[in-house]
């Protein structure tokens, strides 16, 4: 059984190895709160169909094509959500489709991507999701991540760097092409924010996974890293860096998953 790693897991490890250990190795559960994702999911699905199923014999799809895609994926939404989604897609069309001479067929739309990394005799499977992957005219790839949140909230720079590095590794292995940009496209505001990707992002992630592998291999070194993240950490009650008399850590639910492999590749 290989060891699964994702941007979310590696970002947790980067913030605090102890929090990573409690959540992913010790399997402590955390309370999670989710708002209604129905509108966001419907928008993602409509845009996926728009870019995946357009026949590309003509330079640009029409607005009618956008309406058709939206109609097929807006069942179950409230009337106000349908109206709101229509306005969001009309704005998207005007800004990212109608303003172009032509659009090109994406390399991939709405899927999963995997990569592999071997270090410290452990095999890591890198996994992630994407909304769209485009070929760039000057070479390389752009990964586009749709955001349907009401506010434009950018992750910390370090978290973006980790996400870029993991996608860089996975895309390079899958398509033999380098990631040039990770783009966050905020659907409600029509803003598209691009982050340049380089080989340094890949190296940073390789080093971080190597450090994680050493801790996993020897099952030690999970010291807390105090910081601003402590205020919202759900494991604060168990942490000696935050709580004077921390609660005992509950018994582990399952053993860590480790897989022997070859040397770092």
Predicted ranges, named:
Residues 1-9:
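Short acidic, Pro/Gly- and aromatic-enriched capping/linker segments at domain boundaries
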Residues 1-2, 18-30, 67-73, 143, ...:
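Short amphipathic alpha-helical segments and their helix-coil junctions
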Residues 4-5, 138, 170-265:
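Metal-dependent nuclease catalytic regions and adjoining charged, substrate-binding loops involved
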Residues 10-11, 15-55, 85-86, 90, ...:
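Nuclease catalytic cores
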Residues 13-20, 42, 54-70, 177-186:
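Short, compositionally biased low-complexity segments
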Residues 16, 43-44, 132, 167, ...:
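A residue-level signal for conserved active-site and pocket-lining positions in enzyme catalytic cores
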Residues 45-116:
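A non-catalytic, helix-rich entry segment at domain boundaries
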Residues 111-209:
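Mg2+/Mn2+-dependent nuclease catalytic core
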